[in-house]
Structures are given as structure tokens and as C-alpha cells.
């Protein structure tokens, strides 16, 4: 955007005055992936001109300055906050069944601990074990696999069959860091770069329902790739200018 979109469509803006900072509270990027993926993401972002600060927690923002835990201030009018999720409190769920972020503790069958006949799957649920003391990663595959296993257990329960405890099958993780740049963690192989980016595109294209929708998305991607332009834009009007 800084290199192609702003100089082309917003001549009144000086793109050289735009700085992009990424402030990460942890000591590495992509903590849910391998060290290789985190290091690759850091290199790609740095190559793109993003100034990355690790171990930096933002504690406040007043509309003009973002303040960190150490007291350092960053002047900015545009702040994107990506600090994770927190579940809403649900009446009837005891506090003893809640973990950090209001995640609900469940057993290996996804039943809420301390509450009978109530189940939770996906991001809202946390299933602890010796191998996973902090629960499963909060990704779509966990939710899908838990939902399928729970549905099968409901059928088994109706037929008086043995219930099956949930066991997560890690199919791998991917993250894209812009054009031609991505990182992929597979159970037996970790790689990055253009091949990883193509794999990310293929997997996400495959997940789209309908042949027509797949073709439309693929065409939009091709246009964006070859023209360095984005077909989707959000126009944000200045409220003060509208009143004037």
C-alpha cells in the first residue's frame, strides 16, 4: 500500500512520511508456530520496511500517542489493536470452570467441567493435558475436529456405544506475510517463501464454496497481483468535513 497504492491514488499524501510499527508483547512473532516460522516472519516484515519491536507492550492510547509499558510513546493517528480475544461470561457457568480470557474448562469429551450436559468447542473451550498445559491452539481446525468428534459422540450415546475422547490431529499451520511471502509448518516439513505462499493461496481457495466463487476470488487475486492494486477499498469520510 505504501509503495504502490498511496503514490498512485493519494497524491496529496507523502508516502515517505508513513512509518509502520509492529509492537509485539512477546519475545517472538507467531508464538503458535515454530521458531523457524517466527524468524521468517520477522525477516519478511523487516524487508518490507516494517519496524518490529519485540517485548513491547502497549498499555494505552489517547488518540494521538500509543504508550508502552516502559513509558515510551509512539505518535500515531492510526492504531490497529490485535491483542487476542476474551469470551463473554455465561450465566450458569461457575467461575471455577473458567480460565484466562474466560475460556471454559472442558474434559476430553468437551463437556464443561463441573456442569453436566453442557459442552463447549473451539476458541471458547480449553482442554488441558500433560502435552498441552495451555490447551489447544485457537485455530479453526481444532474447532472443526472437536465439533465432529462431539457430534459422533452424541450418536454413540444414543446407541449406547463407547464415547471417544478427543485427540487433535495437527494438519499444519500457515501464515502469509504479503506478496510471495509466507511460512508453513507441516507435521514433517517446515518451509517458507514463494512455495509456501502458493500453498497458502491454494488451501484458502479450496475452502471457498462453489466453483463460481472460486473463480471470482482467483480472478481478483490475479488482478491484484499483476496490477499491484486492491479491488476492495473502504472510503472513510471525515465527519468534520461532512458537517462543513
Task: Indicate residue ranges for each PLM-predicted region.
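Rossmann-like dinucleotide-binding cores of NAD(P)H-dependent redox enzymes
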Residues: 1-56
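Cofactor-binding loop segments of dinucleotide-utilizing enzymes, especially the Rossmann-like FAD-
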Residues: 25, 123, 179
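A conserved short coil-to-beta-strand element within the FAD-binding core of flavoproteins
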Residues: 54-65
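FAD-site-proximal beta/loop scaffold in flavoenzymes
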Residues: 65, 73-145, 152
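C-terminal, flexible cofactor-proximal segment of oxidoreductases
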Residues: 151-244
Amino acid at each position: 500500500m505504501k509503495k504502490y497504492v498511496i503514490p498512485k491514488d493519494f497524491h496529496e499524501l507523502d508516502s515517505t512520511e508513513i512509518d509502520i510499527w509492529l509492537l509485539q508483547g512477546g519475545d517472538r512473532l507467531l508464538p503458535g508456530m515454530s521458531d523457524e516460522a517466527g524468524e521468517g516472519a520477522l525477516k519478511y516484515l523487516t524487508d518490507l520496511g516494517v519496524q518490529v519491536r519485540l517485548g513491547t507492550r502497549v498499555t494505552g492510547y489517547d488518540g494521538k500517542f500509543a504508550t508502552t509499558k516502559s513509558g515510551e510513546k509512539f505518535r500515531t493517528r492510526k492504531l490497529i489493536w490485535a491483542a487476542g480475544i476474551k469470551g463473554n461470561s455465561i450465566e450458569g457457568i461457575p467461575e471455577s470452570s473458567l480460565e484466562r480470557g474466560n475460556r471454559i474448562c472442558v474434559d476430553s469429551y468437551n463437556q464443561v467441567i463441573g456442569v453436566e450436559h453442557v459442552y463447549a468447542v473451539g476458541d471458547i473451550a480449553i482442554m488441558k493435558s500433560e502435552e498441552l498445559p495451555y490447551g489447544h491452539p485457537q485455530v479453526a481446525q481444532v474447532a472443526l475436529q472437536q465439533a465432529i468428534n462431539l457430534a459422533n459422540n452424541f450418536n454413540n450415546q444414543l446407541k449406547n456405544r463407547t464415547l471417544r475422547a478427543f485427540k487433535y490431529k495437527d494438519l499444519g499451520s500457515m501464515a502469509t506475510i504479503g506478496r510471495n511471502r509466507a511460512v508453513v509448518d507441516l507435521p514433517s516439513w517446515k518451509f517458507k517463501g514463494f512455495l509456501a505462499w502458493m500453498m497458502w493461496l491454494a488451501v484458502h481457495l479450496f475452502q471457498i464454496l462453489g466453483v463460481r466463487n472460486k473463480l471470482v476470488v482467483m480472478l481478483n487475486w490475479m488482478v491484484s497481483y499483476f496490477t499491484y492494486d486492491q479491488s476492495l477499498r473502504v472510503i472513510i469520510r471525515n465527519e468534520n468535513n461532512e458537517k462543513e
